[in-house]
Amino acid sequence: NSPGYPSNVQFVFNMGGAMGDTSWLEAGDAPMVAFHPVGDPFAPYGVGNVIVPTTGQFVVEVGGSREAIRLSNEKGNNACFANAGFTDALTTYANTVNEGFEGLYPLYTNPAQQAGPWEWFDSTATVFYASFLPPPYNTAGGTAYSSALITNPDMSKAKALAYLDTIMGYLNPRVVYCLNLS
């Protein structure tokens, strides 16, 4: 762990990420919930390659959200919420598409190959703030915004907030339940 940061993690959640080495997961680790676009072109939903968004270059094979949650369930780490009896609409939906992996919320996007549908930012602000960076990055704001649209073509605040609402609606009851916060 990094010096100065505590390592007594009590709950983990992930949005579109992956584990560099799934052997890091051990029985007794914190419960885990993950949200992941199934067609994410950069970080695999299952087991696969991480790709650099700007170059398309291979980085490393990793375990995506599906694999991390599968292993977390296999090791009993999600037992605190697996049988909690959640019956809300988000849980009901997740359970129809997550192959029985409690804590996994697959995101089926349109178009299918999207990364980070919960992201949005203002093109004017992006260009403006980039102008304060040293060359050659000071002219990259427009490129950054245009590149983001490739994998999130209908990016908007309304879309992002709808995804974040779903994420919070599914995640928060599990955190509250497992950490006895009610």
What is the role of each PLM region?
Residues A30-T124, A130:
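Active-site-adjacent alpha-helix of alpha/beta-hydrolase-fold enzymes
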Residues N1-G28:
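Primarily recognizes the serine-hydrolase "nucleophile elbow" in alpha/beta-hydrolase
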Residues N1, N14, V97-G100, Q113, ...:
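Generic detector of intrinsically disordered, low-complexity, polar/charged segments
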